[in-house]
Amino acid sequence: MHLIRPFTGLRPATGRAAEVIAPPYDVLSTDEARTRAEGKPWSFLHISKPEIDLPAGTDPYAAQVYAKAAENLGLMMREGILTRDPARCYYVYRLIMGGHTQTGLVAAASLAEYEANRIRKHEHTQTDKENDRVRQIDALNAQTGPVMVAYPDAREVDDILDRCSAGAPDADATADGGVRHSLWVVRDAEIQARLTRAFDAMPALYIADGHHRSAAASRVAAARRAANPRHTGEENYNYFLVVIFPHHQMQILDYNRVVSGLNGMDVGTFLARVRENFTAEKSPKPVKPAKPAEFGLYLAGQWYRLAIRRELIPASDPVARLDVKLLSDHLLGPVLGINDLRRDKRIDYVGGIRGMTELERRVNSGEMTAAFALYPTRMEDLMAVAEAGNVMPTKSTWFEPKLADGLVSHVLD
């Protein structure tokens, strides 16, 4: 069994990509999705967020929602908006956001290798979110949300992808926000074989974004395997939809924190506690950390540059030395009493795409008391955590640009 293989992708008909592609299902609320899809009958949001086509207030996890997704997918196929390639292909997918470009391979990845941890994870998943994706995949009989994966340095693969994307793309669309999504179909059997061999030679791949989608695909495969007396391992359900990028091209933005209250302390007392483990210097302008172990703090209209004391940074533990963990272990927990980062209502998270002004706005509005700006987690840190078999703290990574839903889907029959 190969690590990856080509597949017969379901994708927008020629010239229809701009009408179809949509942000990932989990970055928009129902109301946001309804607004985005207004006047766009072929937006993939009608499949990924199908509750927008049902009465307001419909439970997004009701059976009728998944049925509506299947109905909408069937309609788009019957109307020729989505068409399926007749033969197995790989696809080269390029994302351009501002001055950033990354080029990856769309493929079907082996769930057996995922379950054997050759496709490595770095996050825990939540059962309710997994359940939602399982029901979506089963209802559609397809995986429509690609998992973002990284491969370690492989010049041969980089060169093949560059050559395959040298001509005009088969699909090209600029989405809301200005991100350009381009797709090239790789039909040549010899090039496909070279790509398959190159990935077979890799010791591991690393999931960057999409842990719930991959876990759900694994669960669907297990159920179908158990129900299929003629199971061979070659069925499409034994693979999951991925886009694999070279790790050095992937862009992780800062994932910042805002907190409500100072755990009963006034500003002076709080800063004194902070200075037990950090240096803290006032700054006349916003502090966007320029290196690891440096943090920005915005409090009472004032920015501070924080630096954790070097002796507190573990030399070898790949999780404990992460900036998100250092902040939690030496400030959020012991000073503010925020120990459950997933459930504590006093903390919220702000993706770096929103900028420093959003941190100031959340505090200046009185909604939050303090904001912490962090240096982005590096891909090398993520890979080290995955190699050690550990998991990242919650809200450690914010990848940009995001993959589009609807550009290529993986049908399970």
Enumerate the predicted regions with their spans.
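Surface-exposed, charge/polar-rich loops and edge strands
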Residues: 1-413
